[in-house]
Amino acid sequence: MIHKEIWRKILFYSIISIIAVIIIIPFFWMISTSLKERGALMAIPIQWIPDKVSFEAYQKLFKIFPFGRAIFNSMYVAIMTTFITISSAAMAAYVFAKIEFKGREKIFVLYLATLMIPGQVTMIPNFLVLKYMGLLNTFTGVMLPSLINAFATFILRQNMKVIPNDYIEAAVIDGASHFTIFYRVVLPLSKPIIAALGIITFMGTWNSYLWPLIILTSKNKMTLPVGLSLLNGQHGAEYNLLMAGSLISIIPILIVFLFTQKYFEKGLTLGGIKG
């Protein structure tokens, strides 16, 4: 019995190790390629570790394209979108979960029905509306269509519904307004799921490509994914340049995830239990 358990553990950790290596190899290859000189990219045999480490690709990257500006643009759009989206979703979730009014459930169902509409269907109408409002080639135009998130509202509502009404009733007796109850009672109890949704929203916005490509026309306002696509078109054969740009683009995501991993896992667990 003991031997069987040992072999099970060996098999389990062997499989996990193989999967981990398969996942890590592309990332390692990206780093290796970004540190190679152009002449070493097609070397035979393949150089997994460059014979000569070169930062030429990173230096060239910031010379041929306003990469620093693109990073700032992506960071600004991602942070603002995440903050406003989660704030609006949390307030809407509180209304649907804790405030009784006529037709609440029907309105919520209609609200959720928007999840069934593909983004491609609303892309042209959104573009025309933003054009009419004069918001093309602006960060506001990029952010505006995604500031209302029915999925985030649904997850937060499910989380808030299980918060005991006794807390809210006690706050009402003390003379607290709905805003005070929301800010001081409900939000602190919803921190893990808010953190998880915040990370998901940030990552989705940071990696967004098609909508910023349509809305933004100025090079100084382009986000990082759009900048990388232009890099691919102009310097398609310079793989070290492309890998350097791709590596820089994923660093912020890795940093955010590493520092918020425990909140992310806890939030998803709570969301699954309470949903």
Give short role names for the model-derived ranges.
Residues 2-275:
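A structural signal for multi-pass alpha-helical bundles of membrane permease subunits
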